[in-house]
């Protein structure tokens, strides 16, 4: 497949990736909620870490020309990860914790999401860079 793909194909990739990402996000969220409960937004944290790791992998796989930028950036980066990751949910979870007066949980949530997601993206990038040398 060439780098020039039709607009219809681009929208189809975004839609397909989005449907898969949203479905997997819901599935993982339910698993984590059943496992760890609702006392802390672990489900949001988990999908954000997985999504950040996957974005790091994707970025380096495209940079190393292992994946096609037009297809995989659209399907996975925009579609799948756009629906899978949950920055808006992370923001709401943090705000609700603050409104409930649970400043410590809110601070921990913010710290964990930011630090672990950046670390996960870096790990994904590092793995591809190391494996492609």
From Swiss-Prot:
Gene Ontology CC terms: plasma membrane
InterPro entries in UniProt: FluC
Disulfide bonds: none
Membrane topology: Multi-pass membrane protein
Regulation: Na(+) is not transported, but it plays an essential structural role and its presence is essential for fluoride channel function.
Transmembrane segments annotated in the record for this chain: 4-24, 39-59, 78-98, 108-128
Role according to the record: Fluoride-specific ion channel. Important for reducing fluoride concentration in the cell, thus reducing its toxicity.
Protein name: Fluoride-specific ion channel FluC
Organism: Colwellia psychrerythraea (strain 34H / ATCC BAA-681)
Gene giving rise to this polypeptide: fluC
